[in-house]
């Protein structure tokens, strides 16, 4: 708790859980600068993370504020990704945000088939068990500086929003995109890699398109 963590190299996350581990953190100041370096991250075998308070910023390409292959709960924290999706959840895992600020700016990348703020997916890399991905956000704010908001592909997924103050990008490409993909990283077999999505909004204002196939 009450600690500053700064990383500068690629694949150097801020705080990390894997192999079924448990991590509890409070009031950290975390900044990562390399590629594939999420401020809050997990890896194979998952685990549990409980985070209360603090600031978590990722600045590198492909470095979300939260990369989730575990069960992660974050409350009363500021989360920001400057060159990536803000949140990536893969496979049978969950992220719960309560009274957090979440923002992101993602540059265009030819490997991506769309630009989103929160993505729930299955990469088939083996980093996570296949199953339903869960994202919930209550209170706080969500800011998108470009592209769309919520994207899910090649997985079962569920979203829950309540009382979130949303700032949309100027283009507001989509509110929710629930489709297959032709991603160059190989997220399932094209034509067979759609998403089965449940989206629940509770006393939530929303605007934008819903795309599905």
Task: Write out the residue ranges for each language-model feature.
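Surface-exposed loop/turn motifs in large extracellular/passenger domains
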Residues: 1-7, 17-35, 41-84, 89-110, ...
């Amino acid at each position: 708790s009450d600690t500053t963590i700064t990383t500068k190299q690629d694949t150097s996350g801020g705080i990390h859980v894997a192999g079924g581990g448990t991590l509890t953190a409070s009031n950290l100041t975390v900044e990562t600068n390399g590629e594939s370096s999420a401020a809050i991250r997990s890896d194979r075998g998952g685990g549990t993370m409980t985070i209360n308070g603090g600031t978590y910023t990722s600045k590198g390409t492909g470095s979300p504020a939260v990369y989730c292959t575990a069960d992660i709960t974050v409350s009363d924290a500021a989360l920001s990704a400057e060159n990536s999706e803000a949140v990536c959840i893969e496979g049978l895992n969950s992220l719960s945000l309560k009274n957090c600020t979440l923002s992101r700016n993602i540059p265009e990348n030819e490997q991506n088939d769309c630009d989103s703020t929160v993505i729930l997916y299955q990469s088939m890399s083996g980093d996570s068990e296949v199953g339903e991905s869960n994202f919930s956000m209550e209170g706080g704010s969500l800011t998108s500086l470009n592209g769309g908001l919520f994207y899910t592909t090649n997985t079962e997924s569920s979203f829950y929003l309540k009382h979130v103050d949303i700032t949309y990008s100027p283009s507001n490409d989509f509110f929710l995109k629930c489709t297959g993909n032709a991603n160059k990283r190989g997220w399932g077999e094209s034509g067979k890699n759609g998403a089965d999505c449940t989206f629940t909004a509770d006393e939530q204002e929303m605007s934008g398109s819903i795309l599905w196939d």
